[in-house]
A protein has these predicted regions:
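Radical SAM [4Fe-4S] cluster-binding motif and immediate context
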Residues: 1-124, 134, 149
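Flexible glycine/acidic-rich beta-alpha junction loops that bind and position SAM and/or redox cofactors
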Residues: 41-42, 96-101, 132-142, 157-185
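Short, electropositive alpha-helical surface patch
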Residues: 43-52, 139-159
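A broadly tuned preference for mixed-charge, low-complexity surface segments
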Residues: 80-89, 143-144, 181-185
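Residue-level detector of anion-binding/catalytic polar loops
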Residues: 84, 127, 157
C-alpha cells in the first residue's frame, strides 16, 4: 500500500491541471475521491493555493472527517478551498454502537459541532451530507427509533442531506430476535 504523503501532487501541477481543464473544457466541478481529504492541513492548503493561483471558480465535493476538522482547526481552510459539498461519515447516534465501530467522538458532540459549522460558518454556501447505519452491533429497536427521532429534529440535525443504511447482513436467529431489525408492521 501507499505511505501517507507519497502520492500527493505539488501545487504547481494542480494549478496547471485546473487551468487546462477550465480553459479547454470548462471544467470547474470536481469530486475529490480521497476518503480522508483533511487528514493533513497540507492538502487543504495546497488546494486553497491552487484555487487562488489558477483563478478557476472551483466547486469541490469532498469526504472529510469531522473529528479532524475540529481537532486541526480546519474550517477556514475548508472555506478557502472552493468546497461546496462535504460528506461526513458520522455513522451512528448510538454512543455504544459508535464505540463498537471505532468512533472515538461522542455522536451528540459531533452533531453539536455540525450545527456550529452550519449556523456560524457554512450557512447555505456549503452543503453537508452524512450517512447513518442502522443495525450496528449495539443497536436496538429503541435506539434506532431514538436516532430517527433526533434526525427529524431540525434544531438537532442541521445536515442538508441524511442517508440511512440498514444492515441486514446479520442474518442469524439471535440477531433477528434481538429487536434491532424492525419486523413487518413496526
Amino acid at each position: 500500500g501507499k505511505e501517507k504523503g507519497t502520492y500527493e501532487r505539488g501545487t504547481s501541477l494542480i494549478v496547471d491541471e485546473l487551468k487546462r481543464n477550465w480553459e479547454e473544457h470548462g471544467v470547474f466541478k470536481y469530486w475529490v475521491m480521497d476518503d480522508t481529504f483533511n487528514d493533513t492541513n497540507y492538502k487543504l492548503e495546497a488546494v486553497a493555493e491552487a484555487k487562488e493561483k489558477s483563478g478557476v471558480p472551483l466547486d469541490l465535493t469532498v469526504f472529510l472527517r469531522l473529528d479532524l476538522q475540529n481537532r486541526l482547526k480546519q474550517t477556514e481552510l475548508i472555506k478557502n478551498c472552493g468546497i461546496t459539498s462535504i460528506y461526513y461519515g458520522i455513522e451512528t447516534l448510538n454512543p455504544d454502537s459508535a464505540i463498537a465501530i471505532g468512533k472515538g467522538w461522542h455522536p451528540d458532540e459531533q452533531m453539536a459541532y455540525a450545527r456550529e459549522l452550519k449556523e456560524k460558518h457554512y450557512h447555505d454556501k456549503i452543503k453537508m451530507f452524512t450517512t447513518f447505519i442502522w443495525g450496528l452491533p449495539e443497536d436496538t429497536k429503541e435506539s434506532v427509533r431514538a436516532d430517527y427521532k433526533k434526525l427529524l429534529d431540525f434544531e438537532y440535525n442541521k445536515f442538508d442531506h441524511v442517508y440511512m443504511n440498514f444492515l441486514f447482513m446479520r442474518d442469524t436467529e439471535s440477531y433477528k430476535n434481538s429487536g434491532a431489525v424492525p419486523t413487518e408492521g413496526e
